[in-house]
């Protein structure tokens, strides 16, 4: 499937119609879905309706934006009016939202074609998409392996060319880690840059919506479309949004890059370390100056996150009581109905995180756990602040390993949590981070390089990511799907 700019050119030159592009995407989904299972819901009627409207605009010689007529997948934790939004949970099995999320509304208004809602770990809690209450998504590079998570459906859909781009959400690495495992580009923007209105909350101080694409330019285009102030989101930043494509510079002359020392230690696969080091050498060859940077509190990100995120989740998920929507288990009393509904509706990982969160917020433990974790969070942010005094962009592996086999870590939550070791501190500090493909292991599984910049400096990520991408061929590789 071509890039956004290539498809846009074909549309305005009338070489292809939006309906033809959409039909091709829907046919690809029909052919690939039995193997990959990226989507929970295919929105063919709405997609073709949007595509027809784009074709009518072109016929009337009206100007269209870059995303008009472009097939896009939406993670199924973003509210879509009249279309099921399950969050990958049985508790929301029959839920059809009465309102549209800000990001999907923005995309709808510019004519982007939503082809479906993608699979995810239940309520975005997980790193493999195995926690979905409906199906397990496969990694397009090896169908026996996981695509990462929690936005595994979106990453797999883009890698398998079922859509051109997709939206995911990232609370502790849920865009960047699956992007790494599926060999695509994934961006977590600065906290507050993209509206969270209509995103079903997991960890409200950490969640952020961002794009997946096969190229850095595609991701930059989508970010430009979804970013911006929204009065419906109190954490939304009131700032002008630049044209992110202006940062796509193939030269890195004058760019200072820091290698986060703490990420090259225990638990990192040797092939991942070797591949990432080669990528760093390439950045140097493109003109960047490289130095080693210490972020001493980086390693405490994981334990701090697994106190803060479950604490916020336990409060956010208290609203699922079956009174007004979702599945309901009948019972003699209201309390019994709550208990039976939540016991049946939530999966084991969600229950685990609710329990952890309830415990850490309870009297007698709040100061010892939650408050201490928030203090650690502040120290991690201070480490990043100090690092950005001397460098423009920080680099490290996105994930300590390549994709693991489905079922391999389901009985070992701690091992699963370690998948987000490199990505979590970026969320805790509210910074933008992007994963770009930088090679493959001996089994042909993708490896990602994580780029991190200071608050609201996504442009620097696009500069470094684009320069690296244009000087390599990794983004052109395609999974061996039949």
Swiss-Prot record:
This is Glutamyl-tRNA(Gln) amidotransferase subunit A. Transmembrane segments: none annotated. Keywords: ATP-binding, Ligase, Nucleotide-binding, Protein biosynthesis. The active site is at 75 (charge relay system), 150 (charge relay system), 174 (acyl-ester intermediate). Allows the formation of correctly charged Gln-tRNA(Gln) through the transamidation of misacylated Glu-tRNA(Gln) in organisms which lack glutaminyl-tRNA synthetase. The reaction takes place in the presence of glutamine and ATP through an activated gamma-phospho-Glu-tRNA(Gln). Its EC number is 6.3.5.7. Belongs to the amidase family. GatA subfamily. GO terms for biological process: translation. Signal peptide: none annotated. It comes from the Bacteria. Heterotrimer of A, B and C subunits. One of its GO terms (cellular component) is glutamyl-tRNA(Gln) amidotransferase complex. InterPro entries: Amidase, Amidase_CS, Amidase_dom, AS_sf, GatA. One of its GO terms (molecular function) is glutaminyl-tRNA synthase (glutamine-hydrolyzing) activity. It comes from Rippkaea orientalis (strain PCC 8801 / RF-1) (Cyanothece sp. (strain PCC 8801)). The keyword Lyase does not apply. It catalyses: L-glutamyl-tRNA(Gln) + L-glutamine + ATP + H2O = L-glutaminyl-tRNA(Gln) + L-glutamate + ADP + phosphate + H(+).
């Amino acid at each position: 499937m071509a890039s956004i700019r290539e498809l846009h050119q074909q549309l305005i030159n009338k070489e292809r119609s939006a309906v033809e592009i959409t039909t091709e995407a829907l046919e690809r989904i029909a052919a690939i879905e039995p193997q990959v299972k990226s989507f929970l819901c295919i929105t063919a009627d709405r997609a073709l309706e949007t595509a027809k409207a784009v074709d009518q605009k072109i016929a009337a010689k009206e100007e269209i934006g870059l995303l008009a007529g472009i097939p896009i997948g939406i993670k199924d934790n973003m509210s879509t009016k009249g279309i099921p939004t399950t969050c990958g949970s049985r508790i929301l099995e029959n839920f059809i939202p009465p309102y549209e999320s800000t990001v999907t509304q923005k995309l709808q208004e510019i004519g982007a074609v939503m082809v479906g809602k993608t699979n995810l770990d239940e309520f975005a809690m997980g790193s493999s998409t195995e926690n979905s209450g409906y199906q397990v998504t496969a990694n397009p590079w090896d169908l026996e392996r996981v695509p990462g998570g929690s936005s595994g459906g979106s990453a797999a859909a883009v890698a398998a060319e079922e859509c051109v781009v997709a939206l995911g959400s990232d609370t502790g690495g849920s865009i960047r880690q699956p992007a790494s495992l599926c060999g695509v580009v994934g961006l977590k923007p600065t906290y507050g840059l993209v509206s969270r209105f209509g995103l079903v909350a997991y960890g409200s101080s950490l969640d952020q919506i961002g794009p997946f694409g096969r190229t850095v330019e595609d991701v930059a285009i989508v970010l430009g479309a979804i970013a911006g102030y929204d009065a419906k989101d109190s954490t939304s930043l009131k700032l002008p949004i630049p044209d992110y494509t202006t940062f796509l510079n193939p030269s890195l002359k004058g760019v200072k890059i820091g290698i986060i020392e703490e990420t090259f230690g225990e638990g990192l696969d040797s092939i991942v370390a070797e591949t990432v080091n080669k990528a760093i050498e390439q950045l140097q060859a493109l003109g960047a100056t490289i130095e080693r940077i210490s972020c001493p509190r980086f390693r405490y990100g994981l334990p701090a996150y697994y106190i803060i995120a479950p604490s916020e989740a336990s409060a956010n998920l208290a609203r699922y009581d079956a009174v007004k929507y979702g599945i309901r288990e009948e019972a003699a009393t209201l309390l019994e109905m709550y208990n039976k509904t939540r016991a049946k509706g939530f999966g084991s990982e969600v229950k685990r995180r609710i329990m952890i969160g309830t415990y850490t917020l309870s009297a007698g433990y709040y100061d010892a756990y939650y408050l201490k974790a928030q203090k650690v969070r502040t120290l991690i942010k201070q480490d990043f602040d100090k690092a950005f005094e001397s460098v423009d962009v920080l680099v490290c592996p996105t994930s300590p390993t390549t994709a693991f086999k489905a079922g391999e870590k389901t009985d070992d939550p701690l091992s699963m949590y370690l998948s987000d070791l490199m990505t979590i501190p970026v969320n805790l500090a509210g910074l933008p981070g992007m994963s770009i493909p930088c090679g493959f292991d001996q089994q042909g599984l993708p490896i990602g390089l994580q780029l991190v910049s200071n608050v609201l400096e996504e442009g620097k990520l696009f500069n470094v990511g684009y320069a690296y991408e244009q000087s390599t061929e990794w983004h052109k590789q395609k999974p061996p799907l039949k």
